[in-house]
Curated annotation (Swiss-Prot):
Keywords: Cell inner membrane, Cell membrane, Glycosyltransferase, Membrane, Transferase, Transmembrane, Transmembrane helix. Belongs to the glycosyltransferase 2 family. OpgH subfamily. Pfam families: Glycos_transf_2. This is Glucans biosynthesis glucosyltransferase H. GO terms for molecular function: hexosyltransferase activity. GO terms for biological process: glucan biosynthetic process. The chain crosses the membrane at residues 146-166, 200-220, 519-539, 576-596, 610-630, 686-706. It comes from Pseudomonas syringae pv. syringae (strain B728a). It is a multi-pass membrane protein.
Length: 860
């Protein structure tokens, strides 16, 4: 529907949404057409009325920010003379060439035989070979051999105990001659108990070795933190107060994709202001690298970027770019940054969408890089904070209390051949560009294509090139947030599971350091241990059924004088069970002991932290079987080729509805009940051993829902349960993040795309930031006209997201659509725009709105 409004009336409404004085509005109110209005706003003649809105973009954009934009030289023109906003620095391209993967060892061997296996090194290869071999490399190798001996020795002893517990003691009494003379059914019945036992014993050995690795890691971390005598810690390489060299420029890059915009830019602003407080802001630039494909969120990002630059005077320091082609997801986003601007910086700090880092932490990372010339990556240990649901608070408490032990333990065993977790870390740009670009995995299927979990692979490539990868486990000032509930965590786990399984294809790639081969293996075991545990339990139940339902064979050989009795040693079972419990829960007890020794005030005191630990242990016991079944499903889905979506995890407090919980956990509850009934029917006494599993599954629905409640989390915090030091005495960066998040939500942009089309100021910003700036060409003009006509024909409600993205990226099409909506009076668009303003209780007060519409936020 068009032409529903007389031009003067709609023109007055248009002027009311421009930040002008009454005199300026009165002067422009005499215009008879919108083309004339835009011509007078632009103060230059307009030959084509269809381009009138495009001509006035500069004036509409700079009505309130002219001084700041001009001082920072943010305004420019493209090749066609259209105004654009310099949201990114000038491009200085650097070559980024990924090396193709050769994952097939047979093909690699053939290439070596034919003389094609060793391609020439690139000329720019500048590995730090002139540096002396650091002593830590030898020490790290010795430590890892010790760890391997401890793990295997512990596993062998436990396996021996497990073998003694099982009722059938080995295969020695199974006669091959007897088997060959029996029917297949008789052979199967005779061999089945032994086959089940052997499978159980094998799975037990793998799982116990996995638990043992975690135990020794936590134990060494405990000793490191208790004594404080770690001469190889990377944070000791710098005195901490050296001036940062002028050439040591660092880019803070934040890749985002359909994220919570108020929270993202609140954390960015808090980090920016913290860096500014150090006096070293001139050494840092900030980049928001968006892969967002939801147009409403994309427009909100544009406005949030403009607001944070205006409020912090960050024009020319805080940059924003949204990619139109989302190639290789997050790693491709970083590749694009390195290709366009990476050559301008010596270092890069990667931030996640929920990351917050203090200025002291960031400047310390730069100093550590300067003091350690062979370090390629230094990873901080982010501390979780900022969430209020009961589930998130327990996870925050667990990572804050137990996490330091495991992180310090990882450093003890790995030293400079450690992990990189993809964010809150500093990276040396030159070797990263030259060696860490990721080619897609060859082949077809679920484990081919773009690498999903890029961080472990980039660390492995950095180490393969001769650079160290360190964890600065004792460096404060690095923060992140956790998913608010179990289901959101599991969504994230599905992506991580698929990514880690893909990475294992690189296990035998030439040149990888053994430590990073082990990292690929542990990444797989993080999720593969779930189906192994599940199959272990299933086989144990099957063995119980065999022992209960099948008549035991006491005489296996002819003329056997004495029967072969199945053996049962309950004392060994209790001893092995107790040992396993110690390995699982002793690290948590050691964590609390360490807090007692160092000071428990920030955790609510000794009593509260101990009770919190016990409650968290109970909660982890309830959730372990639930995670086991979900992870088993994820592993099977990956191997079967079911697609894993890459939606961003929920980063705000969010309760799980009962319907959603029943949908997700209902099959688990049913499985737990049926499993319990089966075991009770077979042998009621065995149900006590299986009770922690089946009871947890049957309680999964209420546990998932209740733990996601914010009110319970807040009440626990008020009672000082699950308290962490970042809540007891919050750092300024987190205080600022909370305050800015609240303020940003108060003024958050709703219905962003409709605003970008209709609103005079929002349209100017969207046109100035649009990146599809083609030169004049007839085919392009035809496509633009078709897109604008289609948008006007179907209206905002029926316009698809892909069509919206095309319009948002094209400044000419967006300007023409804006001009025609107003000049032709397309009521469907105008009504949607007015409704979006009416639905926003905190919209700026405008002359045509009733008094009392807007009010100022009251920070909490």
């Amino acid at each position: 529907m068009s032409n529903s409004l007389p031009v003067p009336m709609s023109l007055n409404e248009y002027l009311a949404h421009l930040p002008m004085s009454d005199e300026q509005r009165a002067e422009l109110a005499g215009c008879t057409t919108f083309a004339e209005l835009h011509e007078r706003l632009s103060a230059q003649p307009v030959t084509d009325p269809a381009e009138a809105a495009q001509a006035s973009v500069g004036r509409r954009l700079t009505l309130t920010t002219a001084d700041q934009l001009e001082d920072a030289e943010m305004l420019g023109v493209d090749a066609s003379g259209r105004l654009c906003l310099k949201a990114t620095p000038p491009i200085r391209r650097t070559k980024v060439v990924p090396e193709p993967w050769r994952t097939n060892i047979l093909v690699r061997g053939w290439r070596r035989l034919t003389g094609k296996g060793n391609p020439p090194k690139p000329e720019h290869d500048d590995l730090p070979r002139d540096l002396p071999k650091a002593r830590w490399r030898t020490v790290g190798s010795i430590r890892r051999y010790i760890l391997l001996i401890l793990m295997l020795g512990q596993t062998i002893v436990a396996g021996w105990y497990m073998k003694g517990i099982l009722p059938y003691q080995g295969w020695s009494l199974v006669s091959l001659d007897e088997i060959t003379r029996q029917t297949f059914v008789q052979t199967a019945l005779q061999v089945m108990p032994y086959a089940l036992q052997t499978s159980i014993l094998l799975l037990f050995g793998i799982l116990f070795c996995w638990v043992s690795a975690g135990f020794w890691t936590a134990l060494m971390g405990f000793l490191e933190l208790l004594t404080g005598r770690d001469k190889y810690r990377i944070s000791g390489a710098s005195a901490g107060n050296e001036p940062i060299e002028k050439g040591a420029r660092t880019a803070l890059v934040m890749p985002i994709c359909n994220e919570d915009v108020p929270r993202v830019f609140a954390g960015l602003r808090a980090t920016f202001e913290s860096v500014a407080a150090t006096g070293d802001l001139d050494r840092f630039d900030f980049f928001v690298l968006s892969d967002t494909n939801e147009t409403d969120i994309a427009v909100a990002e544009q406005q949030a970027w403009l607001d944070v630059c205006r409020e912090t005077k960050g024009f020319g320091k805080i940059f924003y770019r949204r990619r139109r082609r989302r190639v290789k997801r997050k790693s491709g986003n970083l590749d694009d940054f390195c290709r366009r601007w990476g050559g301008d910086y010596r270092y890069m700090v990667v931030l996640d969408a929920d990351s917050v880092m203090s200025g002291e932490c960031l400047t310390s990372l730069v100093r550590l890089m300067e003091a350690t010339p062979d370090a390629g990556i230094i990873q901080t240990a982010p501390r979780a904070s900022g969430m209020d649901t009961l589930y998130a608070r327990m996870q925050q408490f667990a990572t804050r209390v137990y996490g330091p032990l495991f992180t310090a333990g990882l450093h003890f065993w790995q030293l400079g051949e450690s992990h990189y977790w993809g964010h809150n870390a500093i990276i040396r740009m030159k070797p990263f560009i030259e060696h860490c670009a990721l080619a897609p995995l060859p082949g077809k299927g679920a484990f081919a294509g773009a690498i999903l979990s890029h961080d472990f692979v980039e660390a492995a490539l950095m180490r393969r090139a001769g650079w160290g990868v360190w964890i600065a486990y004792d460096l404060p000032g690095s923060y992140e947030e956790l998913p608010p509930n179990l289901l959101d965590e599991l969504k994230r786990d599905r992506r991580w599971c698929h990514g880690n399984l893909m990475n294992f294809r690189l296990f035998l790639v030439k040149g990888m350091h053994p430590v990073h081969r082990a990292v690929f293996l542990t990444g797989v075991m993080s999720y593969l241990s779930a189906p192994l545990w599940f199959f272990f339990l299933v086989l144990s139940t099957a063995l119980l059924a065999v022992n209960t339902l099948m008549e035991p064979t006491y005489f296996l050989e002819p003329r056997q004088l004495y029967p072969l009795w199945p053996q049962w040693h309950p004392e060994k079972a209790v001893a092995l069970f107790s040992t396993t419990i110690v390995l699982l829960f002793l690290p948590k007890l050691l964590s609390v002991i360490l807090i007692w020794a160092k000071g428990a005030k920030g955790f609510g005191g000794k009593f509260k932290v101990t009770v919190s630990m016990l409650l968290e242990m109970l909660f982890s016991v309830l959730l372990a079987p639930v995670r086991m079944l979900f992870h088993t499903r994820f592993v099977l889905a990956a191997f079967l080729g079911w697609a894993a979506t890459w939606n961003s995890p929920q980063r705000d407090d969010d309760s799980t509805p009962w319907i959603e919980a029943v949908k997700r956990h209902g099959p688990q509850t049913l499985l737990g009940a049926c499993w319990a009934l089966l075991v009770f029917w077979l042998n009621p006494s065995f149900l006590w051993w299986l009770a922690p599993i089946v009871v947890s599954l049957m309680l999964s629905i209420p546990v998932s829902v209740i733990s996601s409640r914010t009110n319970l989390g807040v009440k626990a915090r008020d009672e000082k349960f699950f308290l962490i030091p970042e809540e007891f005495e919050p750092p300024q960066e987190l205080i600022s993040t909370d305050r800015y998040t609240y303020e940003n939500r108060w003024h958050a942009l709703k219905q962003g795309f409709i605003r970008a089309v209709v609103d005079p100021r929002q349209n100017a910003l969207a046109c100035a930031l649009a990146t599809s700036r083609h030169r004049q060409a007839q085919p392009i003009e035809v496509v633009r006209m078709e897109r604008v006509d289609q948008a006007l024909k179907v209206g905002p409600a029926k316009l698809g997201n892909q069509e919206r993205l095309m319009l948002l990226s094209d400044p000419v099409a967006l300007g023409r659509l804006h001009e025609r909506v107003w000049s032709e009076g397309h009521e469907e668009w105008l009504a949607a725009w007015r409704a979006s303003i009416e639905a926003d209780p905190h919209a700026p007060l405008l002359p045509l709105q009733p008094e009392g519409k807007a009010s100022e936020p009251v920070p909490v």
